[in-house]
């Protein structure tokens, strides 16, 4: 789950202090214009996203909607095959080609109009993650 935030320090404190999540990774993803944090929860993660500028996709989201749930992500073994299958099924891809995400993963987004109103991210984790 990706959560757009305005103050990443306060968000980390909220999740660590109240929901027993642990900071797993933090980096700036310049290509997406965000500071991203992964918090461990069970076998998955919550991803916190702070926009680096107001004209980035997450910055525009926060300006329009305020902080909150941004997207749901699903890990796959082969993002290229998954995107091909999804496109063939008629779903609308925001990204026809994967781009680099957190921890050098390969990511692509599907448009909410074809996924029940939910911005959906497909993630092929880099080796070892």
What are these regions, as identified by a protein language model?
Residues 3-45, 84, 88-91, 96, ...:
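Core segments of cupin and vicinal oxygen chelate
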Residues 24, 55-60:
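A short, acidic/glycine-rich surface segment
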Residues 48:
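Carbohydrate-associated surface elements
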Residues 73-80, 88-94, 99-102, 114-127:
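Hydrophobic, ordered structural segments
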Residues 51, 55, 122-125:
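Amphipathic N-proximal alpha-helical interface segments
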Residues 44, 67, 117:
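Structured loop/turn residues at beta-strand edges in well-structured enzyme cores
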Residues 63, 113-114:
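A general structural signal for stabilizing positions within well-ordered secondary structure
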Residues 1-6, 37-40, 59-85, 108:
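Vicinal oxygen chelate
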């Amino acid at each position: 789950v990706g959560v757009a935030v305005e103050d990443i320090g306060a968000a980390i404190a909220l999740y660590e202090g109240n929901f027993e999540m642990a900071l797993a990774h933090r980096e700036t993803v310049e290509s997406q214009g965000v500071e991203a944090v992964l918090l461990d929860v069970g076998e998955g993660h919550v991803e916190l996203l702070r926009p680096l500028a107001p004209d980035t996709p997450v910055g525009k989201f926060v300006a329009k909607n305020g902080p909150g749930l941004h997207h749901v992500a699903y890990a796959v073994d082969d993002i290229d095959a998954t995107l091909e299958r999804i496109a063939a099924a008629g779903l609308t891809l925001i990204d026809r080609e994967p781009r680099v995400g957190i921890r050098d993963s390969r990511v692509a987004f599907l448009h909410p109009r074809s996924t029940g109103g939910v911005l959906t991210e497909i993630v092929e984790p880099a080796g070892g993650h």
